Amino acid sequence: MTTAFRRLSLLPLLLALAMLVALPGAHAASSSTGSKPHRVILFVWDGMRPDAISAEDTPNLLALAQRGSRFEDNHATYPTFTMANASSFATGAFPGPLGFYGNHFWAPGASGLNAKGAAADFRDPIYTEDYAVLRDLDAHFDHELLELPTLFAAAQKAGLTTAAVGKSGPAFLQDYKQGGVIFDENTALPLAFAKELQQAGYALPAHTANTYPSDQLSLREDNDSPTEQGKMVTLKDGVTADATAAAETTPAPANAWMMKVYLDVILPKHRPDLSVVWLRNPDTTQHLYGVGSPEFHLALKAQDELLGQLEARLQQLGMAQDTDVIVVSDHGHSNIAGPRDLFPLRQINDGRVAGIDNDWGYSVSGGIRLADQLAQAGFTAFDGSGCMYVPVMSGLRAGGSPLQQTRYDDDGRLCGKPGAYTTPSYLVPEILPKSALVIASNGGTEYLYQPEHDAALIKRTVRFLQSREYIGAIFVAKRYGDIPGTLPAESVHLENAARGPDIIISYAWDADAVIQGYRGTEYASQANERGEHGSFSPIDVHNTLLAAGPGFQQGFSDPLPSGNVDVAPTIAALLGLSLPKAQGRALREALAGALMRPLTDYQVKPTTLQPRQPATGLTMQRIDGSALSATSFDFAVKLKQLDADGKSWTYFDQAGPERH
């Protein structure tokens, strides 16, 4: 890791903007100065870590940070998933009050089609990075997919034009009521815009054909699939990502195509007052190959090149002087790994896992399939997935033996088709047993649902989870009262009696463990990937936030805590909009002119939340089955409280276990 930007924290930008809307008498630049509101482009670098900004990989982003405002202590919304943070960007609020829990959550009873035109499976936990699934869920929830108003709706009501571009799911969520131009990996909306692109000679996302009746829109024969993702480079086993690969990153061509459409058509012809451009890099690349891998650096360079294209186009169109560009990530990103004493890092030679190399090796461990862990302990659990074959990421122990043995389904009766597997199928059955637990697997954090809300079963499940080393923090729905060793979901803004899960767990993490030069590892939902997020690790929680333009101070480093929940209120302040139900604040300390509020007006108070009492008398186990000497489980949530004018905002830094 190099660089010039490591000391520049990107986080406080969100705070200033959010405060502006929240504080009495706060209005946009247009109302306070009489000038035209600034155009705002929110450019989301999915999964971008602040410590990945460098002169070598991201010179354009580094330059923007140095000339504009940098937020040194920015916080992703927990859980640190893409769609949870997308909902915060959309509304300035948290998942509990919104009733939206992405990326996977359980919504039995919903129905409809997905972007591919096939029936969406809502019996199992549903994956929400799909515009059609989001429309299905909106209908299921009486057209209140998000239970608070959105920034895009406020902008459109005020007569402003909007554009949402990029990654399927989070881009669409910004404008899920479909009031402006939408162009994502699966569709182009509205119909007039889709036809406009066709007439101009641009190919449409291949699944756009499923958005409209065939008599309204059909794809040209040469349309191709411009937003299709490339294939992962694997080891010789055919399923595990080869962390040494150094080919073009899988999302790069699709990202470049969507940016081209934005720069060539949407920006000059539609001239949106508010844009969200959300692209997959470096997140998808980090998932597949890991943070610090050769592909990781290629992904950063590809994304930075697109930022350079955006800035050059704004200059060419004469828009640079009245456009605020905000660069933010939805979350940080960690490598998936278990404790080094159990699972040392390994070399990769010729597509195969080789000898131990704890100095510059790659992880071969850290995947947890919680449904399987619960089933082995006698619980009835389902996670909505079939058989999994994870030959490497399931873990090679120090002695060289696999943690999970490979088995074979010779006739396909168990897995649906013949083949090797390491864990069996846990699809949700048509008739769900009353004692069942349904798990929505989300990477670094899991949601557990108990349809009958059986308090005794919930307590027994919590007790089991507390006895496992791979569990870092446990939150429970308020209906279950005070369970030792847990905190209520409302303590981290995850309460929602109608839609929320019964148990929320963050997997354990190690913020100091280093792989390929980057700190941060965590246990995560089992898959053949090397990177993950979603946990309450400080690496996942602390993300990138930078801004430059006429609405922001130049060369300003904001030391105050800020969060993704502050982005929408900040943009609302810049555009003269009202978001009265937003829970974030306008980051006024970083704003320019009449909107600015000095740093001296704020007070920051670090504090800690802990369960009222620990869980005691436990028999603790590690992931390999060995015993821990500890017999009690507790955890601590570290946070900061920011105060100004009698108002308070809370920013969560991390939550981790304390075993005794």
Where are the regions that the model predicts?
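Bacterial N-terminal signal peptides
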Residues: 9-22
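Short, structured active-site-proximal loop/turn typified by the sulfatase FGly-forming signature C/S-X-P-X-R
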Residues: 51-104, 161-165
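Secreted, luminal/periplasmic, and some membrane-associated catalytic domains
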Residues: 79-81, 103-112, 116-140, 153, ...
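His/Asp/Glu-rich, glycine-adjacent segments
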Residues: 94, 100-290, 438-440, 444-451, ...
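A long, amphipathic alpha-helix that forms part
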Residues: 248-277, 282-323, 335, 350-363, ...
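Polar, surface-exposed loop/tail segments
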Residues: 469-503, 559-562, 566, 576-610
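Low-complexity, glycine/alanine/valine/leucine- and proline-rich hydrophobic stretches
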Residues: 519-548, 566
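Phosphate/adenylate-binding glycine loop and adjacent helical scaffold
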Residues: 597-660
